[in-house]
Amino acid sequence: MEEPLTVAAIFRGPFNILAISEVLKVVAAVGWSVNYIGMVHRAWKDQIPSIGILPLCCDIGWEFVYAWMFPDFSSHWQGVVRVWFFLHSAVLLVTLKVSPNDWANTPLAHRHIVFIYIFVTIVFGAGQYALAAEIGPALGFHWGGALCQFLSSSGGIAQLLSRGHTRGASYLIWFARAISTFAGFIKLCIRFQHNVDGAPWLDSPMCWFYIVTVLSFDAAYPFLYFSMRKFETPAPQREARIKKQ
């Protein structure tokens, strides 16, 4: 029986390109974990959610399906998906605590915040399960994760634009997400070239559209964040800077 491809298995043999893919997997695993911990910290500190409802609920739905319902198809992550599920659960708890501060101007949603988050999470979980049933859990793991990543990157941009300020956001949250995304994409390309984990989805034009779009969102985010921060500079400091110019 062929030994599963793991960090230990690869590094027991001669160093090769697949060893690099394992290192990138570790980078992505740590990076996403830092991203989630950073969201908990920033949301609690600023008393406002650090992530939108759609990306958060989609992430939890995907993680639940592949951590508990189809664990064999996330086994190459060696339990990391379960860790992410618990970290995201912590993000959800903090988000529910501080969401009233963000939805104060929407009375109907304000009164039903808990129900809304639970309902949307169940819907995304059902959708992830349906996708796995439709195209198989192996591809469903990748495409369901692609949706999570698209919503996470686009949601960060949308959150800045809709709020008009940087509360609830930080360079750390962005950097951890961006480096994890980039490392994950390179890992998938390496594994695709070596036919590991059965990743035929990189042959899809839609997949490359998704990759380019997500990377573009993550590349644009720090510039938008920096622009927002300039507008948040206290008036006296801003006027002093203008006079110096």
From Swiss-Prot:
Its main location: membrane. Pfam families: Pyr4-TMTC (PF25129). Its EC number is 4.2.3.-. It is a multi-pass membrane protein. It is found in: Membrane. Keywords: Lyase, Membrane, Transmembrane, Transmembrane helix. The keyword Lyase applies. One of its GO terms (biological process) is terpenoid biosynthetic process. One of its GO terms (cellular component) is membrane. It comes from the Eukaryota. GO terms for molecular function: lyase activity. The chain crosses the membrane at residues 17-37, 51-71, 76-96, 113-133, 138-158, 170-190, 206-226. The keyword Lyase applies. Pathway: Secondary metabolite biosynthesis; terpenoid biosynthesis. Belongs to the paxB family. Terpene cyclase; part of the gene cluster A that mediates the biosynthesis of the fungal meroterpenoid acetoxydehydroaustin. The first step of the pathway is the synthesis of 3,5-dimethylorsellinic acid by the polyketide synthase ausA. 3,5-dimethylorsellinic acid is then prenylated by the polyprenyl transferase ausN. Further epoxidation by the FAD-dependent monooxygenase ausM and cyclization by the probable terpene cyclase ausL lead to the formation of protoaustinoid A. In A.calidoustus, the austinoid gene cluster lies on a contiguous DNA region, while clusters from E.nidulans and P.brasilianum are split in their respective genomes. Genetic rearrangements provoked variability among the clusters and E.nidulans produces the least number of austionoid derivatives with the end products austinol and dehydroaustinol, while P.brasilianum can produce until acetoxydehydroaustin, and A.calidoustus produces the highest number of identified derivatives. This is Terpene cyclase ausL.
